[in-house]
Every structure is written in C-alpha cells, then in structure tokens.
A protein has these predicted regions:
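Glycine- and acidic
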Residues: 151-155, 159, 216-222, 331-334
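Structural signal for hydrophobic packing residues in well-ordered secondary-structure cores
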Residues: 138, 169, 173-176, 180, ...
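Conserved, mostly hydrophobic/aromatic
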Residues: 24, 57, 92, 134, ...
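A non-catalytic, amphipathic alpha-helix used as a structural packing/dimerization or gating element
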Residues: 129, 133, 137, 160, ...
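Non-catalytic, usually N-terminal nucleic-acid engagement modules in DNA/RNA processing proteins
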Residues: 1-182, 296-299
Length: 376
C-alpha cells in the first residue's frame, strides 16, 4: 500500500491524497460504506460501484468469522471473490463488536473471550488470531485487535485499557510481519490509537502507534458517548503526532458535520453505519439539510427526492413516493434511502477533496456544516 498527498489546504490540516492498493486507488478524504457481514445493507454491489461510487467498503472480522466462517471464505478465494467486489476492502478487527457484547465477553492478557450472539458458543480472539482471520478474509487493509472502552470511562480504567491495547498491538504487529498474504496480493496493517478523552493518554498512544512505522494509522474509541467537541479535541491531539505521510483513519464517524470537521483536522478515511441505518429508518441527509421521510409534509411533494443529488434514485423518485413507501413499510423505501445517503456521503468527501485542491476548503466547510445540520 502507498499513500501520496496531492494537496494541503491552507489554514487547516485538511489534505487530499491517493491510497494505492492491489485492488485499486482510493482518493482521500474518503468515506467507506460499512458491509459488516459482506453486504452493505439493502445495496447491491453494482449500485455501490456505479451509483454510490464507493472506492472501498468495510467488512467485519467478528461477524465474518462467526458466519459464514473462514473455511467458506477461503474456499471462495477470499472475501473479494466471495462477495463479487473488485475494489479495496478494509476489515475491522472485531474489537468494537466484542466490546459491545458487554456481559458476554471477558478481556484477558491472552485476548478477548466472548460468546457468539448467534448461538452462544464460546470463542477467543487473540491479537495473533485476528491477524490470521484477516489473512483468510484477504482484506486490503486489516486492523489490530484493541479494546474500545466507553467514552465515559474514568482515567484509571482508560489507562489500564490502553496498556492492554498496546501489549496486544505489539503481538499483532509481530505476527503480521511473520505471516504472509494468502491470495497473492499485499495487505496493510493499521494500528489503532486509543486513550478515551484524556489528552495525555491519547498522546502516549499516538506516539506508540507512530513508532511502529505501519503503512497507515487509525484513531479508535471516539463517537462512543463523548461530546462532539471532545472528539474533535482528541483528533487534533492525535494528528499532531501521527506521521503526515501515512493515511489517518477515524473509525466509526459519523454525521456529515462530523466528517467535515474530521477532514478539517487532518483525517483521511472514515466509516459509519449512520447513512444506511438512519436511512432505513427514514432519515435522509442532503446538501440542504436532513429530511425525515415519514413526516406528513412530504405527502404531496412531487419534486425529486433530492434535486442536487448524484444518485439515480434522487431524480427517479419523488419525495411523496418515497414517503409513501416508508409509511407502507415497503422494503424499497430502505433501499432508496440507503443508496441516496451513501451517494450523498461520497459526494460530500469528493467535494471536500476538490475544495482542498482548489484552495477554498475552509470557507466551503464552514458554510456546508451549517447546511447539513439544518432540519428540513
């Protein structure tokens, strides 16, 4: 994997670049649709490719390990072939999912014990096993196993958690360098900065991660209950330390405004389930603001779903029709909304990239943050 910075914005840390992988190039800043179990919910791969214009998607180690399992994925020749996706894939280590299980998991020095949410069976994720699973998946970018503590964690817990994450990271990094890809193309390994909302812990973790010299670095443990301003502060603290010449991936973030603020602070990659999850519940994000498609105000609005939208669905269907589909609980409503929201998110980061290159990102961003938070 290679990363080239093409432009640096003035009066801001925002930058535009290109990540080169075995499965293609990724223009940055980039938003990555989440395909947890090998599927972006309600969206075909051809729609992701041609309509949404996704350059990279996510898969999740925890979910893919449990179902369909590594034997099936290996027989298929890796996740790319299994799901019919020729562009890059990033896989999360599953650490966040294990953390989310709460009462059904135990963290030990050896790794994370957990019970499957599917059948209750007991499993152990070690830093080494998570690398092996992601070798079997064949993702272009794999993540280190970490603990993702709640944003409300006290300092003592946050420090203990960070120490465990760093010890796991050393083991995972060592194992990554001692193993080889299974499908004939290179894979990158991203370590994850943790430390909750404590600046000294974030600095310590960022330095630890930077010193590894991995091909890219991730920022985890944010957007987990802390105020947005605290999240932005932690991004600044971390990005002051992480090397400029490596891509920076902010995990699990967020709203359109969150994404713009993260890019402003030097983040290159982001992912979140929000555009698809909220879309399935009738919330549409647009360049003019947020629409709740269940609201009666759209019942007789026959204008296009989004006059400024880039997706086919934006101009093919009216607001009234999509509102009708949601009220009638039709599956098509979820599909249309998911495609629209993902296309909007990809449009947003593409526009951000263009404004970084043209030199007016800061002014554009300030105007856009106001617009995208407006309730229509």
């Amino acid at each position: 994997m290679k990363f080239k910075i093409e432009a640096q914005a003035e009066n801001t840390a925002a930058r535009a670049g290109i990540i080169s992988t075995a499965h293609g190039e990724i223009p940055t800043p980039i938003f990555m649709p989440v395909g947890t179990v090998g599927s972006v919910k309600a969206v075909h791969q051809c729609e992701l490719r041609d309509d949404v214009k996704a350059a990279i998607i996510l898969g999740n180690t925890y979910h893919l390990y449990l179902r369909p399992g590594m034997e099936i994925i290996e027989k298929a020749g890796g996740l790319h072939k299994f799901i019919g996706w020729e562009r890059p894939i990033l896989t999360d280590s599953g650490g966040f999912q294990v953390f989310s299980l709460s009462s059904n998991r135990k963290l030990k020095e050896e790794g994370a014990w957990f019970r499957s949410h599917i059948d209750g069976s007991k499993h152990l994720f070690t830093p080494e096993k998570v690398v092996d699973i992601q070798r079997s998946i064949g993702s272009d970018i794999m993540m280190a196993l970490d603990e993702c503590p709640p944003g409300t964690s006290d300092y003592d817990y946050a420090r203990k958690s960070l120490s465990l994450t760093h010890r796991w990271l050393e083991r995972g990094w060592k194992h990554f360098n001692e193993t080889s890809p299974k499908y004939g193309f290179s894979q990158a390994f991203f370590p994850i900065v943790q430390g909750c909302v404590y600046p000294d812990l974030r600095r310590e973790s960022a330095k630890f991660v930077a010193d590894l010299g991995a091909e890219g670095n991730a920022i985890g443990g944010l957007a987990v209950g802390e105020p947005a301003e605290k999240m932005y502060e932690m991004i600044e603290v971390v990005n002051d330390i992480l090397p400029e010449g490596k891509p920076r991936y902010l995990m699990g973030v967020g709203t359109p405004a969150n994404i713009l603020e993260a890019v402003d602070r030097g983040v290159d990659m982001m992912d979140c389930v929000m555009p698809t999850r909220n879309g399935r519940n009738g919330m549409l994000f647009t360049s003019r603001g947020i629409m709740n498609m269940r609201n009666k105000k759209w019942a007789d609005d026959f204008s296009p779903l989004d006059e400024e939208g880039t997706a086919w669905v934006d101009h093919e269907y009216s607001k009234a029709y999509v509102r009708h589909l949601f009220v009638a609980n039709e599956i098509l409503a979820m599909q249309i909304a998911s495609i629209h929201n993902l296309a909007f998110y990809l449009w947003l980061v593409t526009e951000a990239r263009q404004h970084i290159i043209s030199g007016d990102f800061k002014q554009w961003k300030e105007e856009m943050v106001v617009r995208v938070t407006n309730r229509l």
